[in-house]
Amino acid sequence: CZAADKEDDPNFFKMVEGFFDRGASIVEDKLVEGLRTRQSMEQRRHRVRGILRIIKPCNHVLSVSFPIKRDDGZWEVIEGYRAQHSHQRTPCKGGIRYSLDVSVDEVKALASLMTYKCAVVDVPFGGAKAGVKINPKNYTDEDLEKITRRFTMELAKKGFIGPGVDVPAPNMSTGEREMSWIADTYASTIGHYDINAHACVTKPGISQGGIHGRISATGRGLFGHIENFIENASYMSILGMTPGFGDKTFAVQGFGNVGLHSMRYLHRFGAKCVAVGEFDGSIWNPDGIDPKELEDYKLQHGTIMGFPKAQKLEGSILETDCDILIPAASEKQLTKANAHKVKAKIIAEGANGPTTPQADKIFLERNIMVIPDLYLNAGGVTVSAFZZKNLNHVSYGRLTFKYERDSNYHLLMSVQESLERKFGKHGGTIPVVPTAEFQDRISGASEKDIVHSGLAYTMERSARQIMRTAMKYNLGLDLRTAAYVNAIEKVFKVYNEAGLTFT
């Protein structure tokens, strides 16, 4: 019985390594065949297996303990961690979370997921993750600022933060505020001579060098990734569903940044949210829940419970009767114990690692599509890449706004004058006016437009790659393995072509 319990509640990092091993076993032969060398087949296989062993573990893990003096005069020692999984691309990239559940195992698992996530969407970062072992609700804003700034200095002392080295981002219980504190701390100390110092984080406030469109990026990306599969007639026929969002219902576990924005976009495109779950309870309404109304209620009351246009949900939100289930809370929520009770036909992993290997196996047997975390929630790191790679220090589009607008109006005027010369009678005018859609674009692309466009392109391209891989290896609905295969191929190529520094 104890062994069975352990199997259903695996070590998080071992869980990710297990998914990696599954993908590696499928792609190994192809990697061996693809090596263009004079080596024997045995030597090539040794090389491939050696590189796969290099990819798998975490390269560096930092554990720190530091004291703070709280506002009430009490002294406290804070624990924090930062894991860098891979340096095949730099800087390393990954969020910082504040939670009592933070552990070395968790940050290693999340860092490794970041490596594969970046590879899946072709973002040139290595994977990293950090965590501070606190419950932020138990601290004042002043205490949190002290903790954040001190943790930044601990990272800096060990070379675990910097624009070209390691770039944190928000995660659970952190946001623009914390990123701005980190950026200011770094820029005011060891980065004070570096023009790129504020690029030591992504998603600070706009005034601190942030980018428009980053706040909603993960949620928007989640919607776009779901859209790429839900609009695919072949996959929908396998599930016995019709393409499109119009007649679909969905439930969201977690009403944070990812849950809220994914709910907004799905609602906007015609899907109906029937249930929302948080740590203190869940609500449901078969007629639908409006995301804006629920957001306003939570901002006012600090909870979704008691929302007047829904009733309390008895039982688990993961077992809600819906078409699309979005677990956007924390890891290992879908397990062997509840996988048979899930009624959704599509599981969209908004959180990192919400599905255990045993549950994943059950979903495949039950013909349930799982759109995996390393693809689905990569919208945030994709837009972070746009922010990080903006080397000009100028908002995207700012230099071309007026020129594009004037050029568009000159084009319309030229068409109008040509028509009047050809068809106009007695000098009459033939007005040429933009359509409503063109009018929206006529001023040129704003930074947010450019970010959304780049994000959409990335989502579509990554989805096509996963679909092709799933078809190539006859994986059916096993999109997770297809995504891991893609990630492994790309990371392998970097290591193989770069070679090893010292052997």
Curated annotation (Swiss-Prot):
<dbReference type="GO" id="GO:0072350">
    <property type="term" value="P:tricarboxylic acid metabolic process"/>
</dbReference>
<dbReference type="GO" id="GO:0004352">
    <property type="term" value="F:glutamate dehydrogenase (NAD+) activity"/>
</dbReference>
<feature type="binding site">
    <location>
        <position position="389"/>
    </location>
    <ligand>
        <name>NAD(+)</name>
    </ligand>
</feature>
<feature type="binding site">
    <location>
        <position position="216"/>
    </location>
    <ligand>
        <name>GTP</name>
    </ligand>
</feature>
<feature type="binding site">
    <location>
        <position position="122"/>
    </location>
    <ligand>
        <name>NAD(+)</name>
    </ligand>
</feature>
<dbReference type="GO" id="GO:0005525">
    <property type="term" value="F:GTP binding"/>
</dbReference>
<dbReference type="GO" id="GO:0005739">
    <property type="term" value="C:mitochondrion"/>
</dbReference>
<dbReference type="InterPro" id="IPR006096">
    <property type="entry name" value="Glu/Leu/Phe/Val/Trp_DH_C"/>
</dbReference>
<dbReference type="GO" id="GO:0006541">
    <property type="term" value="P:glutamine metabolic process"/>
</dbReference>
<feature type="binding site">
    <location>
        <position position="93"/>
    </location>
    <ligand>
        <name>substrate</name>
    </ligand>
</feature>
<keyword id="KW-0496">Mitochondrion</keyword>
<protein>
    <recommendedName>
        <fullName>Glutamate dehydrogenase 1, mitochondrial</fullName>
        <ecNumber>1.4.1.3</ecNumber>
    </recommendedName>
</protein>
<dbReference type="Pfam" id="PF02812">
    <property type="entry name" value="ELFV_dehydrog_N"/>
</dbReference>
<dbReference type="InterPro" id="IPR033524">
    <property type="entry name" value="Glu/Leu/Phe/Val_DH_AS"/>
</dbReference>
<feature type="binding site">
    <location>
        <position position="117"/>
    </location>
    <ligand>
        <name>substrate</name>
    </ligand>
</feature>
<dbReference type="InterPro" id="IPR006097">
    <property type="entry name" value="Glu/Leu/Phe/Val/Trp_DH_dimer"/>
</dbReference>
<feature type="binding site">
    <location>
        <position position="395"/>
    </location>
    <ligand>
        <name>ADP</name>
    </ligand>
</feature>
<keyword id="KW-0547">Nucleotide-binding</keyword>
<dbReference type="GO" id="GO:0005783">
    <property type="term" value="C:endoplasmic reticulum"/>
</dbReference>
<feature type="binding site">
    <location>
        <position position="265"/>
    </location>
    <ligand>
        <name>GTP</name>
    </ligand>
</feature>
<dbReference type="GO" id="GO:0006538">
    <property type="term" value="P:glutamate catabolic process"/>
</dbReference>
<dbReference type="GO" id="GO:0005524">
    <property type="term" value="F:ATP binding"/>
</dbReference>
<dbReference type="InterPro" id="IPR006095">
    <property type="entry name" value="Glu/Leu/Phe/Val/Trp_DH"/>
</dbReference>
<comment type="function">
    <text>Mitochondrial glutamate dehydrogenase that converts L-glutamate into alpha-ketoglutarate. Plays a key role in glutamine anaplerosis by producing alpha-ketoglutarate, an important intermediate in the tricarboxylic acid cycle.</text>
</comment>
<comment type="similarity">
    <text>Belongs to the Glu/Leu/Phe/Val dehydrogenases family.</text>
</comment>
<dbReference type="GO" id="GO:0004353">
    <property type="term" value="F:glutamate dehydrogenase [NAD(P)+] activity"/>
</dbReference>
<feature type="binding site">
    <location>
        <position position="268"/>
    </location>
    <ligand>
        <name>GTP</name>
    </ligand>
</feature>
<dbReference type="Pfam" id="PF00208">
    <property type="entry name" value="ELFV_dehydrog"/>
</dbReference>
<dbReference type="InterPro" id="IPR033922">
    <property type="entry name" value="NAD_bind_Glu_DH"/>
</dbReference>
<feature type="binding site">
    <location>
        <position position="198"/>
    </location>
    <ligand>
        <name>NAD(+)</name>
    </ligand>
</feature>
<feature type="binding site">
    <location>
        <position position="212"/>
    </location>
    <ligand>
        <name>GTP</name>
    </ligand>
</feature>
<keyword id="KW-0342">GTP-binding</keyword>
<feature type="binding site">
    <location>
        <position position="461"/>
    </location>
    <ligand>
        <name>ADP</name>
    </ligand>
</feature>
<keyword id="KW-0560">Oxidoreductase</keyword>
<comment type="subunit">
    <text>Homohexamer.</text>
</comment>
<dbReference type="GO" id="GO:0004354">
    <property type="term" value="F:glutamate dehydrogenase (NADP+) activity"/>
</dbReference>
<dbReference type="InterPro" id="IPR014362">
    <property type="entry name" value="Glu_DH"/>
</dbReference>
<keyword id="KW-0067">ATP-binding</keyword>
<keyword id="KW-0521">NADP</keyword>
<feature type="binding site">
    <location>
        <position position="384"/>
    </location>
    <ligand>
        <name>substrate</name>
    </ligand>
</feature>
<keyword id="KW-0256">Endoplasmic reticulum</keyword>
<dbReference type="InterPro" id="IPR036291">
    <property type="entry name" value="NAD(P)-bd_dom_sf"/>
</dbReference>
